[in-house]
């Protein structure tokens, strides 16, 4: 049990034991299925925890030059890099930090592949393909929506791939099940398997939430084993993000005031949904609050409000078993993925600290933010 008194407030706190539990499961899937599973930095990049990850996995995936550099310098291995578009300015550094580079279009491949050849370090290049199939319901997160900017459809690929394309990358999941992957593979193979003899690797992207309690990992392993049996020469790669740190930590906050308007009580916190939990408003993703239930049934009902000037910076209603008090701790569950990587300093609101609760039961504070962090971003 975390001793919250050892941490500043607000604070993102990851539990090492829960992280290791997820890492063990993911390594078991990879070993049994004969595939490689790598960490996607877009969901989680708390680099001080990378030594723990390196006990279980070898590589990571990047979507930008900064993520690629983080992979090389902090994770300790070159990145599998994909970006919707590379620039002349960034590409030399992308090459320095990457073992694999996936291009989003043939134009980008034709523009930058000569630089890869000239660089001469053996970078493996691929192209992102669009199977035109995804079961992601939230349009904001659907990479295969009509008119998407991501990937090449089968009708636009030449019969013979250009020299230098060694892999396909396909990403069309978001917190998905193995059964969604099964249906995706049917579409992917129907549209693109005729090119499989020409490539060396197939990256199935992220969104495979294999650490969720109801996820059928045995079915996933069987699926991947079957895919490898059908295409034994292909190296299969998965790059989930959330799965690695699913349910591994919290965001702690405190009540700083309680206001009431038209019968609605709002507990104003020292955190912000728009600044520190943006998916709650964008997705929208419904967070869980420790010791509270969603809904307006009960004696002590509160809306939870963020401490910014955005009118919509609130969530709720929540039912508590007692009246909230100023200074009381409010704990948001499962707030390690897609939070720290997406936070901002809107309004100059104090940014939560970043910390870990070690398996030995000790608090390690990785980062505390200050006025200088805010000032340094502004100019």
Name each region found by the language model.
Residues 190, 195-199, 219-226, 230-231, ...:
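Acidic/histidine-enriched ion/cofactor-binding microenvironments in catalytic or ligand-binding pockets
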Residues 178-183, 211-220, 247-253, 257, ...:
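Short glycine/threonine-rich loop-to-helix capping motif typified by GTGT followed
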Residues 1-76, 272, 320-333, 337-339:
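N-terminal capping/small domains of soluble enzymes
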Residues 133-135, 174, 210, 244, ...:
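Feature marks short, surface-exposed loop/turn motifs that line or immediately flank catalytic pockets
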Residues 35-201, 215, 223-226:
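Active-site-proximal beta-alpha core segment in soluble small-molecule metabolic enzymes
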Residues 171-173, 202-211, 240-242:
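Glycine-rich beta-strand-to-loop/alpha-helix junction loops that act as flexible
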Residues 238-379:
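Charged (often Lys/Glu-rich) extended helix/loop segments that serve as interaction or gating elements
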């Amino acid at each position: 049990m975390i001793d919250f008194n050892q941490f500043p407030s607000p604070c993102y706190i990851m539990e090492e034991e829960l992280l290791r539990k997820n890492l063990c499961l993911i390594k078991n899937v990879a070993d049994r299925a004969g595939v490689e599973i790598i960490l996607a930095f877009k969901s989680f990049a708390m680099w001080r925890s990378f030594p723990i990850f390196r006990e279980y996995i070898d590589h990571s995936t990047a979507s930008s030059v900064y993520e690629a550099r983080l992979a090389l310098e902090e994770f300790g291995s070159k990145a599998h890099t994909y970006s919707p578009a590379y620039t002349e300015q960034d590409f030399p550094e992308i090459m320095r930090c990457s073992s694999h580079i996936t291009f989003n279009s043939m134009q980008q491949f034709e523009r930058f592949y000569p630089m890869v050849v000239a660089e001469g370090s053996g970078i493996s290049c691929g192209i992102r393909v669009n199977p035109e199939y995804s079961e992601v319901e939230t349009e904001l997160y659907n990479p295969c929506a009509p008119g998407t900017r991501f990937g090449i459809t089968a009708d636009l690929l030449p019969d013979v791939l250009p020299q230098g394309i060694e892999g396909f990358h396909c990403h069309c999941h978001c917190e998905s099940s193995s059964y969604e992957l099964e249906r995706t593979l049917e579409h992917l193979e129907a549209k693109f398997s005729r090119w499989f003899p020409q490539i060396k690797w197939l990256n199935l992207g992220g969104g495979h939430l294999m650490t969720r309690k109801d996820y059928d990992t045995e079915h996933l392993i069987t699926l991947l084993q079957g895919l490898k049996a059908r295409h034994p020469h292909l190296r299969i790669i998965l790059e989930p993000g959330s799965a690695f740190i699913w349910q591994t930590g919290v965001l702690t906050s405190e009540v700083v005031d309680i206001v009431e308007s038209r019968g609605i009580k709002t507990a104003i916190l020292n955190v912000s949904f728009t600044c520190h939990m943006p998916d709650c408003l964008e997705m929208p993703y419904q967070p869980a609050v420790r010791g509270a239930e969603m809904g307006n049934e009960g004696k002590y009902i509160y809306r939870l409000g963020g401490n910014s000037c955005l009118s919509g910076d609130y969530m709720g209603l929540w039912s508590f078993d007692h009246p909230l008090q100023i200074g009381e701790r409010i704990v948001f569950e499962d707030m390690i993925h897609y939070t720290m990587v997406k936070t901002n300093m809107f309004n100059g609101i104090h940014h939560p600290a970043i910390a870990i609760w070690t398996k030995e039961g000790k608090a390690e504070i990785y980062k505390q933010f200050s006025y200088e962090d805010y000032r340094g971003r502004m100019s």
